[in-house]
Amino acid sequence: MTAPHGLPRLDPDSLPPAVDVSDSTAALAEVDAAIAQGPYRDDWDSLRAYEVPRWYADAKFGIFLHWGVYSVPAFSSEWYSRTMYLEGTREHAHHLETYGPHSEFGYKDFIPSFTMEDYDPAAWAALFRRAGAQFVVPVAEHHDGFAMYESDRTRWNAAQMGPRRDVLGDLLAASDDASIVRGASSHRAEHWFFMNGGARFDSDVLDPAYQDFYGPAQREETAPNERHLEDWLLRTVEIIDRYRPQVLWFDWWIEQPAFEPYVRRLAAYYYNRAAQWGREVVINYKWEAFAEGSAVYDIERGTMGGIRPVPWQNDTSVSRSSWCWVEGHEYKSVGELIIELADTVSKNGNLLLNIGPKPDGTIAAEEQEMLESIGAWLAGHGESIFGTRPWIVAEEGPTRSQAGSFVDGAEVHHTAADFRFTTRHDVTGDYVYAIALAHPEDGVLRIRSFGTGLRLLPQEIRSVSLLGGGEVLDVQRTEDALEVTVGPGAGSPIGPVVKLHLEPEVVPERTDHLHG
């Protein structure tokens, strides 16, 4: 079944039988039994006892993957499955012009071309390891409703059609072998309304044969019903039990009031199952979907205005224009991505950096090169990132970050007077790092926060050095600044990283009045 544009249509006779999930009573009872075992209850008072794992606070850098059927049209963004059905959009017009009427070639018809025939999960994991990633979060299911894992709750999954393999499970196994912590993301909640545009005109969304894929296709203004909420919960439970992710990332829309009791049940179930596994886990959430302190807050394409007292996360992409593979990406520069990492870490956050693989299972050469370049920088400068904590102040300089979400629309040009700070305390001593965001034209870094006048350094400086093999030519400390004269830049995407080794703190001598 081939369309005029050359892509094969989905053969209805090739579909596996639909899965009956109309009665979830037994599955929900198993969830509630696991919650009853504790230690967490499904109420916010109990869930606020959660503590962010040390491994996550140390990790700092992870890889996000938006892979799926939407990479086949490779047009606009990962929301193509929605916007192609919204009349008046450029995606709708593009689809008509390229693939014909939506009733004859719908979103489902991209599935046969989503083959991932060149997929090499071990090579992917090795690339992520070279990039310096400590954890990986592949999309388990996006808004389109196509599961990238083997599922007993839907026939629309990668193990039964398209690639015909458990691509999520294969990547997580390869990540284990590369000592990368496994995670997964769920974007299922929005599927309640995601395909609703196709219900307003003659399209395959109206075909009852595909209701279990395109549905519910309800209005966004309406609250999800009990069946959708239970299915969301049990699909997520399936991911938890089958793959045991240590990071579980949720997209928006679970902050809708109807989700609240189900979110609490899910969190208690996940935390209790992790306790049974002997694993420390993380839930990432947006907006106000979770009570403060019960999980890890996530900002999309943004940053904080200052240091947050508890760990958080910034999820962003190598592309300014899309999260999935599309033709004609507007890529960020490597320097911009490293600055995002430094900025996030200086404010007590982790950076989750997204790439979008192609439908043949390969990663675009440009995206591979970006990851390799980040890894090369971290190989020489990672001491200022991994395992660090925020210093007294996060940043210095004239170019301040814009706080909030979706603030990466254009590259910000930093100066050599812009710094981000981190600190480390371990058995070898106390250290403070100043990450310069640009190289000084005159060769002198002037770090005002290290001047004697501000009194921000509690200890004397034992030594000053540069990470990454750079050379310190001279050091002068005045009331106004620490001035570090450095050699020529060695091709780093950003400026030098200054390392201060501080003298040990002076501990007051104890006077023993009883045995003096």
List each language-model region with its residue ranges:
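Mature catalytic domains of secreted/periplasmic carbohydrate-active enzymes
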Residues: 2-516
